Amino acid sequence: LTDAYLSLMKALQHAGYQAGRKIVISWIESDALEEGNELCDSEAWKKLKAADGLLVPGGFGERGSEGKMRAISYARTQRVPYLGICYGMQLAVIEYARNVLEEKQADSEEFEAGGAGPHFVVYMPEIDRGQLGGNMRLGGRTTYFRQDIPSLLSPFYQNAPSFSARHRHRYEVNPEYVERLEAAGLMFTGKDESGVRMEVLELREDVHPFFVGLQAHPEYTSRPNKPSPPFVGLIQAAIQHRQSLGTSASTAC
């Protein structure tokens, strides 16, 4: 795991250095959050409930997605700081659609089950569905913060109008459902140059202290002397979360 997620680990450590804290990473197998754990008394759930923040990284495929969404739901409802990267952003959208919009069949076109949907995450229009190799949206891309609504993430980028980060994906938030999601409180504060592709999602600060998703992979440009802004935000929120709880941990599930 340390090799597979090395960039994420380093980004967390860099943010910890800036905050003067040692970051302890607790790995959770998302499959263990799924079936048979309704009482939330498994070791995986104990780890999740003891965490000061939650990071769901990029990934592929349906395996483990239900467990990841249960973890995201926990973080959202219990106000635990959350950062979703790429797939972690897309799953946050589906979780919100299922549990807030009550679209219980909401899913992604990536899921092998191929259900009837509604598909809140879809193939990007420029992607050739018949060829999975060599057709991803790759490399550095610019994300533009919206100027008509406040953003929790923007101050960590010194309120710059935009930022650049590397991308690696072939799916995106379905633009057909953006208006509905925003009406229910899930705000898309960053978009690509077209204004159609969603790049950053957030819950308002009065609703949640730090609930952020990015389509990009900001961990790749994190450095010890210049930590990645979203990870700085996550760690700062996690510190505040721990301080607010004192020595007691959240026990809801």
What residue spans do the PLM features occupy?
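N-terminal beta1-alpha1 cap of cysteine-dependent amidohydrolase-like domains
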Residues: 1-210, 215-253
